[in-house]
Protein backbone atom coordinates (compact mmCIF):
# COMPACT_ATOMS: atom_id res chain seq x y z
CA UNK A 1 0.00 0.00 0.00
CA UNK A 2 1.19 3.51 -0.77
CA UNK A 3 2.92 5.04 2.26
CA UNK A 4 0.70 8.13 2.43
CA UNK A 5 -2.43 5.98 2.65
CA UNK A 6 -0.80 3.56 5.07
CA UNK A 7 0.37 6.40 7.31
CA UNK A 8 -3.20 7.68 7.68
CA UNK A 9 -4.66 4.34 8.71
CA UNK A 10 -1.60 3.42 10.78
CA UNK A 11 -1.68 6.67 12.76
CA UNK A 12 -5.46 6.87 13.08
CA UNK A 13 -6.25 3.24 13.90
CA UNK A 14 -3.01 1.53 14.98
CA UNK A 15 -0.99 4.13 16.87
CA UNK A 16 1.55 4.48 14.04
CA UNK A 17 2.71 0.85 14.29
CA UNK A 18 1.86 -0.28 10.74
CA UNK A 19 4.43 0.36 8.01
CA UNK A 20 4.37 0.11 4.22
CA UNK A 21 6.44 -2.54 2.47
CA UNK A 22 9.55 -0.82 1.03
CA UNK A 23 8.98 -2.08 -2.53
CA UNK A 24 5.53 -0.46 -2.79
CA UNK A 25 5.94 2.46 -0.43
CA UNK A 26 5.82 5.05 -3.23
CA UNK A 27 3.62 3.19 -5.70
CA UNK A 28 1.10 5.31 -7.57
CA UNK A 29 -0.89 5.03 -10.76
CA UNK A 30 -0.29 8.44 -12.29
CA UNK A 31 2.80 10.64 -12.09
CA UNK A 32 0.72 13.58 -10.84
CA UNK A 33 -1.35 11.36 -8.62
CA UNK A 34 -2.31 12.03 -5.00
CA UNK A 35 -2.78 8.73 -3.15
CA UNK A 36 -5.24 10.20 -0.67
CA UNK A 37 -7.57 13.14 -1.17
CA UNK A 38 -9.42 15.13 1.49
CA UNK A 39 -12.37 17.28 0.47
CA UNK A 40 -14.00 19.62 2.98
CA UNK A 41 -17.74 19.42 2.31
CA UNK A 42 -18.80 21.66 5.20
CA UNK A 43 -19.33 24.63 2.89
CA UNK A 44 -20.25 22.78 -0.31
CA UNK A 45 -23.36 23.53 -2.32
CA UNK A 46 -25.80 20.67 -2.93
CA UNK A 47 -24.29 17.94 -5.10
CA UNK A 48 -25.58 16.62 -8.37
CA UNK A 49 -25.90 12.88 -8.74
CA UNK A 50 -23.92 10.92 -11.31
CA UNK A 51 -27.15 10.31 -13.17
CA UNK A 52 -29.06 13.56 -13.55
CA UNK A 53 -31.62 13.99 -10.83
CA UNK A 54 -32.10 15.36 -7.36
CA UNK A 55 -29.77 17.79 -5.64
CA UNK A 56 -28.32 16.40 -2.42
CA UNK A 57 -27.15 18.38 0.58
CA UNK A 58 -24.06 17.41 2.56
CA UNK A 59 -25.89 16.47 5.77
CA UNK A 60 -25.68 13.14 7.55
CA UNK A 61 -28.87 11.13 7.80
CA UNK A 62 -29.64 8.41 10.30
CA UNK A 63 -31.04 5.26 8.71
CA UNK A 64 -32.34 1.90 9.83
CA UNK A 65 -33.12 0.57 13.27
CA UNK A 66 -29.49 0.86 14.32
CA UNK A 67 -29.46 4.52 13.25
CA UNK A 68 -26.49 4.05 10.94
CA UNK A 69 -25.18 7.22 9.34
CA UNK A 70 -25.10 8.01 5.64
CA UNK A 71 -24.32 11.16 3.72
CA UNK A 72 -25.75 10.77 0.23
CA UNK A 73 -24.05 13.84 -1.21
CA UNK A 74 -20.63 12.72 0.06
CA UNK A 75 -21.22 9.29 -1.47
CA UNK A 76 -22.12 10.87 -4.81
CA UNK A 77 -19.09 13.18 -4.65
CA UNK A 78 -16.86 10.20 -3.86
CA UNK A 79 -18.13 8.26 -6.86
CA UNK A 80 -17.95 11.30 -9.16
CA UNK A 81 -14.31 11.72 -8.10
CA UNK A 82 -13.64 8.02 -8.70
CA UNK A 83 -15.30 8.17 -12.13
CA UNK A 84 -13.12 11.16 -13.07
CA UNK A 85 -10.04 9.28 -11.88
CA UNK A 86 -10.88 6.16 -13.91
CA UNK A 87 -11.56 8.35 -16.95
CA UNK A 88 -8.22 10.16 -16.52
CA UNK A 89 -6.33 6.85 -16.27
CA UNK A 90 -8.30 5.31 -19.13
CA UNK A 91 -10.65 2.35 -19.08
CA UNK A 92 -8.28 0.07 -21.00
CA UNK A 93 -5.40 0.66 -18.59
CA UNK A 94 -7.52 0.31 -15.46
CA UNK A 95 -8.89 -3.02 -16.65
CA UNK A 96 -5.74 -4.47 -18.24
CA UNK A 97 -3.58 -3.62 -15.22
CA UNK A 98 -6.36 -4.47 -12.74
CA UNK A 99 -5.84 -1.17 -10.93
CA UNK A 100 -7.77 -1.57 -7.71
CA UNK A 101 -9.04 1.23 -5.48
CA UNK A 102 -10.35 1.40 -1.95
CA UNK A 103 -12.92 3.76 -0.51
CA UNK A 104 -12.68 4.22 3.26
CA UNK A 105 -15.69 5.19 5.36
CA UNK A 106 -16.08 5.03 9.14
CA UNK A 107 -19.77 4.12 8.92
CA UNK A 108 -21.09 0.70 7.92
CA UNK A 109 -24.30 2.25 6.57
CA UNK A 110 -22.26 4.57 4.32
CA UNK A 111 -20.22 1.62 3.02
CA UNK A 112 -23.44 -0.21 2.18
CA UNK A 113 -24.84 2.89 0.48
CA UNK A 114 -21.67 3.28 -1.62
CA UNK A 115 -21.86 -0.39 -2.66
CA UNK A 116 -25.49 0.12 -3.66
CA UNK A 117 -24.59 3.15 -5.81
CA UNK A 118 -21.69 1.32 -7.46
CA UNK A 119 -24.11 -1.45 -8.46
CA UNK A 120 -26.68 1.12 -9.61
CA UNK A 121 -24.47 3.19 -11.91
CA UNK A 122 -23.74 1.62 -15.28
CA UNK A 123 -20.42 3.50 -15.51
CA UNK A 124 -18.92 1.32 -12.76
CA UNK A 125 -20.02 -2.04 -14.21
CA UNK A 126 -16.63 -2.95 -15.76
CA UNK A 127 -14.77 -1.74 -12.65
CA UNK A 128 -16.85 -3.29 -9.85
CA UNK A 129 -14.40 -6.11 -9.09
CA UNK A 130 -11.63 -3.52 -8.63
CA UNK A 131 -13.44 -1.35 -6.05
CA UNK A 132 -13.37 -2.22 -2.35
Give the label of every model feature segment.
Residues 1-14, 19:
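ASCE P-loop NTPase helicase motor core
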Residues 16-119:
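Conserved helicase/translocase motor-coupling segment
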Residues 115-129:
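Extended hydrophobic/aromatic segments used for targeting, binding, or gating
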Amino acid sequence: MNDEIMRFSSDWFYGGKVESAPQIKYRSVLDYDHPITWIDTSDKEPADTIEEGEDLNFKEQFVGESFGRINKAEAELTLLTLAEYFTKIGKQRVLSESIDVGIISPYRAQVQYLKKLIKKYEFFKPYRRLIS
